[in-house]
């Protein structure tokens, strides 16, 4: 069962397990142009079935959260404040799971708060997106222009969406539902993640971390995911044949199962061992 809450104006979806297996909650953070709906379709109910209490928030000005009229004034720091506010509301340290821009927000949140773990899915690297934009510019300049057109909602083209975000087959109904829920992103936040607000590695908490990427990702290439992993001195897993939208690709269960297996080993296992 998934419930929807408004926590001081922030939309939060809450999936409760029928048979809890872990005391550590999961908090999912969406990427740019999206909302908590990114996780509600598949990941929240799936993880609840696995016994995890799973939450997803819509950052301010996204989804059903407040301040939509102030969208373009919102900063990465504002988004981090939202994540920390929901952690306080939970009353305990969660595992933070962020996709794309949400992964960058998770890294920034770890500068200010401890978490039981962190999962970065096709995440913007700690150095920000400037290098990624140059990489895309030189390797796929037409793709960069098409992607910018799509994500600014100036051309609602399902075929362009499929090419930009998906690598596996996706039916037209699912694609159109995804497209209709996309929204503009804060210009200020995009500037922040591009230039001004790199993750502070010296102050960043280092909980157990899982770094995931997609072989066919046209936004956050495997090279950038590998760069993030190198920065943290960790391995990464690149899912073959998948695109940027790991949450909605046909093979999304592969991603969910990888996260669950990691949780069992690195988070749940450490809790059990600590109490033994």
Question: What feature does the model see in each segment?
Answer:
Residues 213-242:
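Conserved loop-alpha-helix segment in the C-terminal half of the alpha/beta-hydrolase fold
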Residues 205, 211-213:
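Short beta-strand/loop motif that positions the catalytic acidic residue
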Residues 78-94:
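Conserved acidic catalytic loop of the alpha/beta-hydrolase fold
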Residues 237-276:
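Catalytic active-site module of serine/aspartate enzymes centered on a nucleophile-bearing elbow/loop
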Residues 31-35, 100, 215:
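Active-site glycine-rich loops that stabilize anionic/oxyanionic intermediates
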Residues 46-68:
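Conserved alpha/beta-hydrolase
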Residues 32-44, 223:
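The serine-hydrolase catalytic nucleophile loop
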Residues 115-149, 189-193:
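Flexible "cap/lid" loop of the alpha/beta hydrolase fold
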């Amino acid at each position: 069962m998934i419930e929807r809450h408004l926590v001081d104006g922030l939309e939060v979806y809450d999936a409760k397990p029928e048979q809890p297996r872990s005391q550590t909650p999961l908090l999912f953070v969406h990427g740019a142009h999206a909302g908590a709906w990114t996780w509600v379709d598949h990941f929240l109910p799936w993880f609840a079935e696995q016994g995890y209490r799973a939450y997803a928030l819509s950052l301010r000005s996204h989804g059903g959260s407040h301040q939509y009229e102030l969208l373009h004034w919102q900063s990465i720091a504002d988004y981090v404040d939202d994540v920390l506010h929901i952690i306080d509301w939970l009353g305990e340290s969660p595992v933070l799971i962020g996709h794309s821009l949400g992964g960058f927000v998770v890294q920034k949140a770890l500068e200010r708060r401890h978490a039981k773990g962190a999962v970065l899915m096709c995440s913007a690297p700690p150095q920000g997106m400037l290098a990624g934009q140059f990489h895309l510019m030189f390797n796929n300049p037409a793709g960069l222009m098409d992607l910018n057109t799509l994500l600014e909602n100036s051309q609602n083209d399902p075929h362009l969406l499929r090419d930009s975000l998906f690598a596996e087959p996706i039916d037209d109904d699912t694609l159109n539902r995804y497209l209709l829920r996309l929204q503009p992103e804060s210009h200020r936040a995009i500037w922040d993640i591009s230039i001004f607000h790199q993750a502070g590695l010296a102050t960043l908490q280092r909980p157990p971390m899982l770094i995931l990427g997609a072989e066919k990702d046209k936004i956050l290439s495997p090279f950038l995911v590998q760069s993030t992993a190198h920065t943290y001195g960790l391995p990464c897993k690149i899912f073959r044949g998948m695109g940027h939208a790991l949450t909605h690709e046909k093979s999304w269960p592969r991603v969910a199962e990888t996260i669950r297996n990691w949780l069992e080993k690195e988070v749940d296992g450490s809790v059990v061992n600590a109490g033994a």
